[in-house]
């Protein structure tokens, strides 16, 4: 918005109003630390969880759809390769992360497995991590793709809570990158998979802008 414009002031007022409303509902203006019993009533109730899912669903943006490959028709394929560092990583945002046993979110791999059931074979390999120059697992991912009818490749960044686990993070508070390109060897992973000639869907899961004009 334009500084000083009526729209800018209205937008700021709305943002502040939302924050203050939640604080009032949590009792933070009556007690410094509020009432812990109110948290699930105000923040983690069914309505708020449903809203969070709706926001996540609507955040997906389709950049390109060559040959109408999307939406993915699982009835057309006998096997799907799900690869990439973000293929089995459920991402909640820059101020939260998930573990392998979480019930708070569903990864791309888990979602496809649940959707496919026993109808098709789902093969998985990460191929590389988010940040390092380790290429030793790319060949494994390429082989998984060769043995499948189509590849779904999830690349991007990884966020953690308040700068924790910096070795494995490439986005979020306190994580700046020197380039807008995909971190690590993810670009090479994509190019090697492309060489297989198999149909390929690229899913970008990122907490910051990335330049990928070649995809």
What are the functions of these language-model segments?
Residues 1-4, 9:
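Single conserved hydrophobic/aromatic residue that forms the stacking wall/gate
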Residues 5, 34-42, 170:
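A short small-residue
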Residues 5-6, 21, 50-215:
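C-terminal non-catalytic regions of proteins with extracellular/luminal or membrane-system context
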Residues 44, 48:
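Metal- or metallocofactor-binding catalytic centers and their adjacent structured scaffolds
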């Amino acid at each position: 918005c334009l500084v000083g414009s009526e729209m800018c002031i209205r937008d700021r007022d709305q943002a502040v109003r939302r924050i203050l409303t939640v604080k009032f509902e949590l009792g933070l203006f009556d007690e410094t630390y509020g009432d812990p019993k109110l948290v699930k009533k105000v923040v983690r109730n069914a309505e708020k969880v449903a809203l969070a899912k709706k926001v996540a669903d609507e955040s997906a943006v389709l950049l390109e759809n060559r040959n109408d490959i999307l939406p993915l028709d699982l009835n057309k394929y006998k096997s799907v390769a799900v690869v990439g560092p973000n293929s089995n990583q459920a991402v909640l945002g820059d101020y939260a992360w998930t573990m392998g046993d979480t019930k708070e979110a569903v990864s791309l791999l888990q979602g496809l497995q649940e959707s496919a059931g026993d109808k098709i074979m789902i093969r998985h390999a990460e191929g590389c991590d988010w940040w390092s120059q380790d290429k030793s697992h790319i060949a494994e991912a390429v082989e998984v793709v060769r043995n499948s009818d189509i590849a779904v490749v999830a690349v991007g960044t990884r966020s953690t809570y308040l700068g924790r686990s910096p070795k494995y993070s490439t986005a979020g508070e306190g994580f700046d990158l020197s380039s807008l390109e995909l971190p690590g060897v993810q670009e090479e992973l994509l190019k090697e998979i492309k060489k297989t000639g198999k149909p390929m869907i690229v899913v970008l899961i990122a907490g910051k802008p990335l330049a990928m004009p070649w995809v």
